[in-house]
Amino acid sequence: PPQIQVYTRHPPENGKPNILNCYVSQFHPPHIEIEILKNGKKIPEIEMSDLSFSKDWSFYILAHTEITPTESDTFACRVKHVSLNEPKTVIW
């Protein structure tokens, strides 16, 4: 099943714009759905890297979006894939 890592490009500081990355790897077949959530709601505009594959033919992809974290906001990455019984959510 897919491995999911959620991290920011720069050290997070409340009120400072940042990029939230959701790196998903070790999945096969290549079809996958990735959402970035803010307070449980899908962020509509996210960027996706090209789908790539590793030496072992598993796939990986990076989804990212600009965020401005605050104390009260929660961000997460939700992944839907055929190898998962239900969507997997990882909170940042």
From Swiss-Prot:
Keywords: Disulfide bond, Immunity, Immunoglobulin domain, MHC I, Secreted. SMART domains: IGc1 (SM00407). CDD domains: IgC1_beta2m (cd05770). It holds the Pfam family C1-set. GO terms for cellular component: extracellular region; MHC class I protein complex. The keyword Nucleotidyltransferase does not apply. Disulfide bonds join C22-C77. Residues 2-91 form the Ig-like C1-type domain. It is found in: Secreted. The keyword Zinc does not apply. One of its GO terms (biological process) is immune response. Heterodimer of an alpha chain and a beta chain. Beta-2-microglobulin is the beta-chain of major histocompatibility complex class I molecules. Belongs to the beta-2-microglobulin family. Component of the class I major histocompatibility complex (MHC). Involved in the presentation of peptide antigens to the immune system. This is Beta-2-microglobulin. The lineage of its organism: Eukaryota, Metazoa, Chordata, Craniata, Vertebrata. The gene is B2m.
